[in-house]
Amino acid sequence: FILGASKSGKSSLEKVLGQSPKVQSFYECLRPDSQIYSNPKKPDQPVNSALRRDNLSISDLFYGNENLLTSDGIEVVTCSNPFAIHSIITLAEALPNASFVFMSRNPMDVAADIFTTEYNASNYYAYDPYSIMEYINWYQDFWDILKEKIPESTLTINFECLMKTPHKIAEQLEVFLSTDIELT
C-alpha cells in the first residue's frame, strides 16, 4: 500500500513499478463492497471486525484474482487509494504479507501542487494554505506512528530520489519486499 498526502508522488511510484512484469498496479481501485474498509463518508459505520482475524485474498480488496495474477507471474500488487489509510490496522492484521510505503516529498512542494490543483469534489482543505499544511503534517505524524508500531512492514521513499533514480528506488523496494521487481 502506497501512502502519502495528495500530490506526494504515490501515482508516480506506481507508474515506475508498473513497468515491471511482476507488478500489478491497482492504483486507487478498491472494491467498494469490501467490508474491511471503514467508509470515511459514514464514520459511524464500523469495520467488520470478523475480517480482522482472517487472512484476506487479493479478490477481497481489488478487482483481481490472486490465482490468475500468480499464474501470470505477478508477485507484487500496489494500491494508492487514499482511503486505505483509514483501515491500516485492519489491513496489517488481515494481510500478514502487506507492506506500507510512504511517499515523502518536500512539504512546500506538495502544498504548492495541492493549492494549484482544481479538485472536482471534496478536498476542501486544498484552498487554504493553513489547512493544506495541517493535512500534510497529519500524514507525516500518522506515518511516524505507523513506523513505530510495525517497523518491519514500513518503508519511506523520497519523491525526489524516485524522480532522479527510479532504478535505485526499485532496488530498495526489492530488498524491502524480498523479491526481484525487474524494471524494464
Identify the function of each model-found stretch.
Residues 1-61:
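PAPS-dependent sulfotransferase catalytic core
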Residues 62-63, 139:
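Hydrophobic residues within well-ordered alpha-helices
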Residues 68-69:
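Conserved motor-coupling elements within RecA-like helicase/translocase cores
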